[in-house]
Structures are given as C-alpha cells and as structure tokens.
Amino acid sequence: MAIRRICELPEPILRKKAKKVPSIDGSIQTLIDDMIETMKSADGAGLAAPQVGVSLRLIVFREPDAKEATVLINPEIVKKEGQRQVTEGCLSIPGYFGELTRAETVTAKGLDRHGKAFRIKGTGVVAQLLEHETEHLDGILYIDHLESEEKLHEIQPEDEIPEEIRD
C-alpha cells in the first residue's frame, strides 16, 4: 500500500468524466488499497480515483462506526430522496468548506472490490458521501452546487490550545 498524492484544483483531471473500470485485476486492487490508505492518512471521509490522478469510476469512503472502508466500483446513483442543508469540504479543495443542499437519502449500485454487484442506501452523512464522491467521477465538485460565493468559507486556523489541557 502507498499513500498517493491528492490532486487539487485547478488540476484538469478533477473536471473530467472518469472511465468505467473495465476489469477488476491486481492493479485495481492495489489502487483500492492505496486509496483507502491515502484517505485515512489525509483524515478524509471519502476519496474518488480522479483525486489520486486515476480517471476511473471508483470510490472509497468510511461510513461512521464501520470497521472497513466501503468500496464502490462503477457506481451509479439510482435514487435520491429529500433534501438537507450540509457543510462540506473536499481533500481536493484544501482550506475551504461550503454550505449546500444534498439529498437526505441516496441509493447507489455498483460492484464491490471482488466484482460482486450490490446496492447501498445511505441516509444523512452516508448519502452525502455517496453523492459527493460519485460526482467526482463526472468532474463535478461541491463548489459547483453553491448558491453564491458567500456560501464558500475559508477554514480559519484554530487558536493555540494551552499545553495543560491538551490530550
């Protein structure tokens, strides 16, 4: 496993439509392992293959309280329900977060890392991850959904925590 460099805006790969994974071979298994390691190293909740410079339809993400990362190859969102206001960031747009609307519930289908077809229905944060990561595969970023520039915020450095109260 290797930690890969995360592509950042304005790198063109982030705006291109990714190609379907033609077959799940050793190179795809390595890519999956590298993406999971990279996501964990960057303390991210999800990662799409284009974010590590590979234009393939593959995403990984961490569901809250799950032991293993979820892998979805050639994902397709088949249903969206409801709406909710969310705050969202992206490893490819460091230093910023935005306020936008996402679906409350998302159902997606695709293949697991072994080529087995499955469906996943996510609500709340999981729905947000499915939508965000799948959009990466079509060159869409969360900033494309912002209603106005005022909805994009720069992350401010945290105040220094006194040594005596650090964990």
From Swiss-Prot:
CDD domains: Pep_deformylase
Cofactor note: Binds 1 Fe(2+) ion.
Keywords annotated in UniProt: Hydrolase, Iron, Metal-binding, Protein biosynthesis
Entry's Gene Ontology molecular function annotations: metal ion binding; peptide deformylase activity
Stretch forming the signal peptide: none
Residues binding Fe cation: C90, H132, H136
GO BP term (any one): co-translational protein modification
Catalytic activity: N-terminal N-formyl-L-methionyl-[peptide] + H2O = N-terminal L-methionyl-[peptide] + formate
Top-level EC class: hydrolase
PANTHER family: PEPTIDE DEFORMYLASE
Name of this chain's protein: Peptide deformylase
